[in-house]
Amino acid sequence: MQKKYYELFFIVEERYKNLFLDFAFDLGIEAIEEKDNGVYIRSHESLEEFSWALEIFAQKLTTTFNLNHKIISNLSLVEKENKDWIQEYKKGIKPILVDNVYIHTTWQEEKKNCINIKINPALAFGSGHHESTYSCVKFLQKFSKSKLRALDLGCGSGILGIIMAKFGCNVEICDTDELAIDSSLENARLNGVDFHKAWCGSIDKANGLYNLIVANIIADVILILEKDIKNHLEDNAILILSGILDKYSTRIKEKFQDLELIDEIQINEWCSFVYKNNKKG
């Protein structure tokens, strides 16, 4: 084991975080941890060039989105004594119980009398701890039923699709990131379930109507996909929208006011809504 390693830390606005994570993955960065309201990147190789590239990327995003403030802050790069980071990482990840669903890692034991969802967090697309995912897991236990045709839109690690499959739904998944599709398929294999269809892309590539759609994605993307989502809802279908910061909740409700809002949860600043396709007018 090498004696030293480099650690880069930065804070990024939540709505842009996934863009920076994708940027890091594209540059071959593998050791990434979200903690202390920011992002840690660790490597045995110098991260000076990556730090510089990160700042350039942030500047370009600021220009692209016509922002008058910095997207990232508290950027720091330090050299540290090495540890066994694999073991440290494992210690830091705790299982999560949401009603009767128990989400745990591949190295943690299952919980009796629960629906166990096994996730490999090394695949880097979420382990169920985010407030939005938590809300979706609660809702899916209520609305997932056998034989429903279901879509996990923006599947990430596949947790939500796996839960729907465990409840007997015929599940399809999609994500614009091919690595997310690979992650979801691997996690499905770990849990002994199959997805009926998986594709890299969005809902515009979907065929037919769904009885249940869950979209745990950011508000801006939900607003962009609003018409496509509605066009793929079966009569009386259930639509779960999540990943929505409370400051965007009014806009989401306005866009989906032609559907019946039947449930909602807010945890901290994160909102999740459940709609039924009883279209008004």
From Swiss-Prot:
Example of a GO cellular component annotation carried by this entry: cytoplasm
Domain of life: Bacteria
Residues that, per the record, bind S-adenosyl-L-methionine: 133, 154, 175, 216
InterPro entries named in the record: Ribosomal_L11_MeTrfase_PrmA (IPR050078), Ribosomal_PrmA_MeTrfase (IPR004498), SAM-dependent_MTases_sf (IPR029063)
Coarse class of the protein's main subcellular location: cytoplasm
Residues annotated as signal peptide: none
Compartment(s) where it occurs, according to its Swiss-Prot or TrEMBL record: Cytoplasm
Keywords from the UniProt entry: Cytoplasm, Methyltransferase, S-adenosyl-L-methionine, Transferase
Catalytic reaction list: L-lysyl-[protein] + 3 S-adenosyl-L-methionine = N(6),N(6),N(6)-trimethyl-L-lysyl-[protein] + 3 S-adenosyl-L-homocysteine + 3 H(+)
GO biological process per UniProt: methylation
Pfam families linked to this entry: PrmA
EC number, UniProt record: 2.1.1.-
One MF annotation (Gene Ontology) recorded for this entry: protein-lysine N-methyltransferase activity
Class of enzymatic activity (EC top level): transferase
Function: Methylates ribosomal protein L11.
Family membership noted in the UniProt record: Belongs to the methyltransferase superfamily. PrmA family.
Name the record gives this protein: Ribosomal protein L11 methyltransferase
Gene label: prmA
